[in-house]
Amino acid sequence: MSKVNVNKVVVAYSGGLDTSVIIPWLKENYDCEVVAFVADVGQGAEELEGIEAKAKASGASECYIADLKEEMVADYIYPTLKTGAYYEGKYLLGTSMARPIIAKAQVEVARKVGADALCHGCTGKGNDQVRFEGAFAALAPDLHVIAPWREWDLVSREQCLDYLAERNIPCSASLTKIYSRDANAWHISTEGGVLENTWNAPNEDCWVWTVDPEQAPNEAEYVTLKVEKGEVVAVDGEAMTPYNALVYLNEKGAKHGVGRIDIVENRLVGMKSRGCYETPGGTIMMEALRAVEQLVLDKSSFEFREELGLKASHLVYDGRWFTPLCKSILAASEELAQDVNGEVVVKLYKGQATVTQKRSDNSLYSEEFATFGEDEVYDQSHAGGFIRLYSLSSRIRALNSQKK
C-alpha cells in the first residue's frame, strides 16, 4: 500500500523504546515534521522525567505534555464507575478508560499545530490500536493515521536498539525486557514473561504497586468514603478531588494488598491474553459505591444498572467511548446515580476490601419493615394475594399442560 503524503504528524510518545524509534522512522519514511505528544495520566513522575529532552533527541521538533490526571478520573473513570462496569466479571478497565482521553488530547494538539496526521505505537495484535483509531475516527476523520507496527519490518527489541544506535540516538532501554506494563492513576497492568504460560503462577515481580496479601499488615485498617451522586467526594472526613481521592485510596489499598487480579481475557482482536492487574483504590471505590447502591436503588433500578454495567464494560473495552450508545449508557447511569448518596466504611485486610458499615439518607432499607419480629407496618397476610398474582402465568401454564 502506497504511503500518503504527510507534512506534520503528532505521535503519542511514551519515552519508551518503541516510540523513540517511531520518531526517526516517521521522518525517514514520511519525510515529515514530527511533534511528540505526552499524556500524563498518572503513570508516575519517573516515567515523565526528562521526557521532552528524550523526544527532541529522537528527532521531534516539539513536545507537548498534557496533565490529564484530574480530567481522566472525573470525566472518564467516575462515569464508568457509576455503570458498575467489570469487563468479563473482573477487570476494572484501567487501560481501556485511559485511551479515549489520550486520543482526544492528541487530536487537540494536532489541531493546535496544524498537523495532518496522527500516529500511535500500538502493535497489530492488541486492543489499543482499535481504541486509538476508533477515537481518531470519531474526533478527527479528516486526519491520516499512521501505525508503524503494521508497516515496518522491525520485529525485536534488538533490532529497535540497533536502529537507534545506527542513528546515534540515545536510548536507556535494555535488550531484555521481561514484562510489558501500562500504568495510570487507576491501575497498572503486567503482561508477558512467565504469565504467557497459564500454568505458571505469577512471580512476585509481576506485582508492582501492591504488597503480597500474605505479607500485608496483621492489623486491619478502615477507611470511610463519602459518596455523592455516585462519586467519592471525601475520604476519612477530608474533601478531595476525584484524582486525589484515588491517589489516597491507592496508597491505603496497596499497603494491604488490595486490588490484585490475574485474568485471561478475550481481546477485541480475537485472541486471548493474560495479565496481572493492580487496582487498589478503584477496588475500594467500587465496593463503596455498590454498598450505597444496595441501600438506595430499588430492585428494578438495580437490575437495570447491572445491565448497563455489562454493556458499558464491552463498549469501553472495545474502544467505543465516543459512540452514541456509550454516551446514552453513561447518561442513564448518571441519572440512576442522582440519589446514590451515603457513607461507607471499608475494612482493608490481607488483600480484601470489605464493607463493614453503610448508611444513606436516601436508603430504601427500613429496619421496621425488614424485622422478622412482630411489626405494625407490614401485614404478612397481604403476601398471599401478591404471590398468587405474581405466579399467575406459571399457574396457567401448568393448568394448560394438565389438559393435554
Swiss-Prot record:
Catalytic activity: L-citrulline + L-aspartate + ATP = 2-(N(omega)-L-arginino)succinate + AMP + diphosphate + H(+)
UniProt: L-citrulline binding residues: Y91, S96, N127, R131, S180, S189, E265, Y277
Residues the record lists as binding L-aspartate: T123, N127, D128
Pfam families in UniProt: Arginosuc_syn_C, Arginosuc_synth
GO MF annotation terms: argininosuccinate synthase activity; ATP binding
Record-stated family: Belongs to the argininosuccinate synthase family. Type 1 subfamily.
Name of this protein: Argininosuccinate synthase
